[in-house]
């Protein structure tokens, strides 16, 4: 109701809840790259810019729009027409060359970029991507990289406008006139990316995308990239730290004549049985209890989303199922995703593995994963287990995804599906089987991983008509939204029985008029 009232009173058009994640909606529909304004009988064109109250506002940088996250007061000031002031930042150039290898995803790329830029140190700086590698980098991949600017510490991660930008504007249904304007304006203003350009930056670094490996990030920080074969060892290292006594403990024991404390073998501890639907299961350290395809970081990217659907399809066809202790979910950032899943015939396979649609929003990425089944929560608490989540999000700090989940791993959507099948991060899924097929034969990740050609054929199902369909009535909302009655008033009409928002008492007891005093009075006397 607050959102709808705000829209009515400011003549703005608010987008109703349940439509998707604001950053993805902005990328797919709202962003224009170049805006126009009519004034004094003339039309002026100027670059699209954006400030938002969420750190991942930077996603729009992938569309050639300069934008970043700000505080609430700054955003409110901008709404009221005030400028956003800032010091001119350093600009770090990030040169991309080559192409991703077969089987490597945009998620693997962004985790590599995040690791490199964190090591470089770009806090408070702009990062601009350049190099001939951009010519083969789809806009969805650019948006994925731009989205994680907060994780690599930059104010923004900017991609200049080029033919790839125009292709995406056309695909997502922007008017032809808008696309023509973007091309003409950016070329005239020197904002267009030309092949072979070597801009001048404060500093720079480079990456050959052909060197990128299949990766996850974890267990606690998005910049801690781990190659897929090393995830099991990274988890064991985490356990060693958990079981290792502090220096204070070792010193105390040694001072009392002991020889210190030997670090126990983590494999010998950390398991608990639980019952579910008449079956007894054993939960161990490293068990994946949450596998979530979530977040605008990846759900805005058709290639990794289609890859997840294809992995699910191949897994179901081979008779694989998710492990019973894994809570799975699918929460895209826009309704376009479910449209292209249906068009590609992949929805049924995701559903069979438990990746049912739970809504269009941030969900698990911001900690809204919901409770785990009670028997599993009790088992975790009983044995103080170090369990895991695997999600296609952008942050994995301990306690963020779920308070009982100590290790959290960022991964591409297809790897999220794979770990739901494996049920643990304690095996090397690049070499060890995920399960057995109907004949009892082991099934490996390579057996269900789609080729680039298969992914491309699936991505070809994404059409402009899907964007037109989902955004045609985006401001109208559903029946519940339309049923909300909004009073026609200049200010908000406070409701005394509201449990959500109440009239603030800040101005109820303001002091009366200042008393008349003589010239010789000091502030102590006034107070």
Residue ranges and their predicted role:
Residues 297, 350, 417:
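Hydrophobic, well-ordered secondary-structure elements that form the walls
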Residues 11, 293-296, 333-335, 359-366, ...:
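Functionally engaged cysteine thiol sites
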Residues 15-18, 24, 31, 37-193, ...:
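Mobile "lid/hinge" segments at catalytic clefts and subdomain interfaces of large enzymes
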Residues 1-11, 520, 524-526:
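Single conserved hydrophobic/aromatic residue that forms the stacking wall/gate
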Residues 348-355:
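Glycine-rich and small/hydrophobic secondary-structure elements
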Residues 5, 287-288, 354:
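Immediate flanking context of iron-sulfur cluster ligation sites
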Residues 196-197, 204-208:
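Structured, non-catalytic alpha/beta "coupling" segments that mediate domain-domain communication
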Residues 19, 25, 31-39, 43-44, ...:
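Non-catalytic terminal/interface segments that mediate subunit docking, oligomerization
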């Amino acid at each position: 109701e607050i959102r709808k009232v705000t829209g009515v009173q400011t003549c703005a058009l608010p987008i109703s809840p349940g439509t998707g994640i604001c950053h993805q909606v902005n990328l797919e529909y709202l962003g224009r790259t170049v805006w126009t304004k009519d004034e004094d009988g003339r039309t002026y064109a100027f670059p699209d810019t954006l400030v938002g109250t969420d750190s991942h506002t930077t996603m729009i940088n992938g569309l050639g729009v300069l934008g970043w996250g700000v505080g609430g007061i700054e955003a409110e000031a901008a709404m009221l027409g005030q400028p956003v002031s800032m010091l001119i930042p350093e600009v770090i150039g990030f040169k991309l060359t080559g192409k991703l290898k077969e089987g490597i995803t945009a998620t693997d790329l962004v985790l590599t970029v995040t690791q490199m830029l964190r090591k470089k140190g770009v806090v408070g700086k702009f990062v601009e991507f350049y190099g001939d590698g951009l010519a083969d980098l789809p806009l969805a991949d650019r948006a994925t990289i731009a989205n994680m600017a907060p994780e690599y510490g930059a104010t923004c991660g900017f991609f200049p406008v080029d033919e790839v930008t125009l292709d995406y504007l056309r695909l997502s249904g922007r008017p032809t006139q808008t696309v023509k304007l973007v091309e003409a304006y950016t070329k005239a203003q020197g904002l267009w990316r030309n092949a072979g350009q070597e801009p001048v930056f404060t500093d720079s670094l480079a990456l050959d995308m052909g060197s990128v490996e299949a990766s996850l990030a974890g267990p606690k920080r998005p910049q801690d990239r781990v190659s897929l074969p090393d995830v099991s060892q990274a988890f064991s290292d985490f356990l060693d730290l958990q079981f290792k006594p502090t220096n204070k403990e070792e010193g105390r024991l040694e001072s009392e004549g002991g020889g210190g404390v030997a670090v126990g073998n983590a494999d010998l501890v950390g398991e608990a049985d639980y019952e579910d639907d008449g079956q007894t299961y054993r939960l161990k350290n490293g068990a994946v209890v949450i596998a979530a395809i979530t977040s605008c970081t990846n759900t805005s990217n058709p290639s990794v989303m289609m890859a997840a659907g294809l992995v699910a399809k191949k897994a179901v066809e081979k008779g694989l199922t998710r492990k019973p202790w894994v809570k799975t979910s699918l929460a895209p950032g826009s309704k376009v995703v479910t449209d292209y899943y249906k068009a590609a015939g992949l929805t049924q396979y995701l559903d069979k593995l438990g990746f049912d649609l739970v809504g269009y929003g941030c969900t698990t990425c911001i900690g809204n994963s919901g409770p785990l089944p009670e028997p599993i929560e009790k088992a975790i608490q009983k044995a103080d287990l170090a369990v895991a989540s695997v999600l296609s999000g952008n942050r994995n700090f301990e306690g963020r995804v779920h308070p009982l989940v100590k290790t959290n791993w960022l991964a591409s959507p297809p790897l999220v599906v794979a770990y739901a099948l494996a049920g643990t991060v304690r095996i090397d899924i690049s070499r060890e089987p995920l399960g057995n097929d109907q004949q009892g034969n082991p099934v490996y990740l390579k057996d269900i991983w789609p080729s680039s050609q298969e992914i491309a054929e699936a991505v070809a199902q994404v059409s402009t008509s899907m964007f037109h369909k989902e955004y045609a009535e985006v401001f109208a909302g559903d029946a519940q939204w339309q049923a909300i009655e909004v009073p026609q008033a200049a200010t908000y009409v406070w409701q005394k029985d509201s449990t959500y928002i109440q009239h603030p008492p800040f101005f109820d007891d303001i002091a009366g008029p200042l008393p008349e005093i003589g010239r010789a009075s000091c502030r102590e006397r006034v107070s």
